[in-house]
Amino acid sequence: MKIGKIDYETFSRFLLDRLGKKDKTVLVPPMTGVDAGVVDVGGGKVLVIAEDPIFTMPMLPLRTFGWFTVHIGASDVAVMGVKPRYMTYSLLLPPETSTKDLKTIVDSIHKTAVELGIAIVGGHTGYYPGLTAPMIGGITVFAFAKKGSYVTPAGARPGNGVILTKGPAIETSGLLSVLRERELAKKYPKSLIRKAKALCREITVVEDALVAMMAGGVTAMHDATEGGVIGGLFEIANASGVGMEVYENLMIYPDEVRMVCEAFAIDPVAAIAEGSLLITAGAAFVPKIIRRLERAGIPASVIGTVTKDPRKRTMRRRDGSVVPLAIPKQDPFWPAFFKGLSL
């Protein structure tokens, strides 16, 4: 069964050369590992724009689903170093959805957008057979910025430090602790499970990215979504044409993340990690970025360096083994997620 994002080979074969009319105003077109597009709109300004679908699961509160919708969409603009400003969304609902549930979702989306300073300027809402739960067919988030003021995952340079916020497998741990709570409760303390469930409200990198950008020296940012931290690191290195040496033992590892990954035999660095921000920055700026993040209540650590040789992109694992940075063939979150749905 094919689950999640298409792989690099499929993207290259079927999408990369099917991007509509060529337009010289497109400065950053669709490409693997790049979270948003950039268009020159004249007057020294650019439009930064991103698109995402959002799914939910039956036991996730609808308020949280609404919160996810805005934060996940906004994160893809924020990682370009630009504050999100506008959004549209398409809310698709099963026909049996109550007006109470509809109100809960749209109230949450509205409230979250207000908190982030985002105006909702369009969208679509409707009831459709075949759906078993509400979903966002697409959220589009965009903003204007000065030309040259944004970053992309292609900006990493040799000598840069590599920073990771929060640690690996944030989204994996949060969602699975909700979906498979009863299984965890048989083996682990309630206090740790509560911490894991609270990670659902950490599935965002909006503040992480904007704080880092304000500190200065950032050359690239990327949120570690499908394929996790190891996949996200590869995408930065590949887009930038550089090498990278990173160390798993330098990553922050919350106990609740260890618990979930241990319980379901998941490799933390390979699992979907929305909420974990990867940053490369000039070495002189790294301490300042870490301080600013920690001052904002966002844990972060330096996990390695960017190197010159693109043939050498490695991660030293906690057991001492050295593995190449690569996008996992299968994100380990999905089998654990669908097994949980079937229980």
Predicted regions and their residues:
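Helix-biased detector of long, well-ordered alpha-helical tracts
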Residues: M1-L343
